[in-house]
Amino acid sequence: KIVSTTFVNMEAVVEAVKNSTSEITIFTSGTTGQPKKVVHCVQTLMRAVRFGEKYINQVWAYAYNPTHMAGLQVFFQAFMNLNFLVNVFNKSRTEVYSLIETNRVTHMSATPTFYRLLLPFEKVYQTVQRVTLGGEKSDKKLYESIGMIFPNAKINNVYASTEAGTLFAAKGDSFQIPAAIRDKFLIQEEELLIHKSLLGQSDSFKFDGDYYHSGDLIEWVNEANGLFRFRSRKNELINVGGYKVNPGETEKVILEIEGVQQALVYGKANSILGNVLCAEVQ
């Protein structure tokens, strides 16, 4: 049922969204098969939104598809604080830098691939105060490059999935499970399992008891404090002669070579070993 409502100002709209019981349907990326429909209530999507006076003058570069989980979460962070959004999605490197400078962007959230596509750079951008990375594994070399482009920015990572939304914030190169929901996670054979109470609704979910297999492999930094690092996606491991090879770790080593800006490691079928590793380097 659609209800027509008139609001006296934007503050009233924000308040209505805060109290909304509406649901939003989004789809998984489909990188591991057919895209799956997931339904989230607005409150779940705003789980990580921060409110307050310190956030009201932010200017966000909008680098995600607005129909995806990450795009929705950046939208709500900006919208709920009445921030200005600058569309840099699918823009060229030159256009992105021009928009950052012209609009005096203060905050950015994007994938590591997006930031790598900003390289090389010709000048620095002093207005950017925070840079967030998510959706893919990052590396030290990229952090260093981002730090040079945006010298006044704090850099952090975020973990979010279409199935669950934002769950963890970064502490350095690690993530921390909040104490309040630490009992909602299990680790089985290095894979992160998420309790169904933290997920959206989908007919495609398959549970192991009350838990959902995220497909993310992790390693503990400090188990007692809920600190961990992501290693890779479970389905990304490549079988080479009976050994499970992590392409992300191989890419990390290649990226440490001077002059290398991007690296993509993948498996290619081989009649003797099953697969051999291949790398494309820029």
Q: Where are the language model's segments positioned?
A:
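ANL superfamily adenylate-forming
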Residues: 1-20, 34, 131
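Short beta-strand->loop structural element characteristic of the AMP-binding/adenylate-forming
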Residues: 1-8, 36-39, 83-91
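Conserved pre-ATP/AMP-binding loop-to-beta segment of ANL
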Residues: 9-27, 54-60
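Conserved AMP-binding A3 loop
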Residues: 23-50
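Conserved AMP-binding/adenylation subdomain of ANL enzymes
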Residues: 46-59, 67-107
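Gly/Ser/Thr-rich phosphate-binding loop
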Residues: 107, 119-175
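Conserved ATP/PPi-binding loop(s) of AMP-dependent carboxylate-activating enzymes
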Residues: 187-219, 225-227, 243-245
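AMP-binding/adenylate-forming catalytic core of the ANL superfamily
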Residues: 215-282
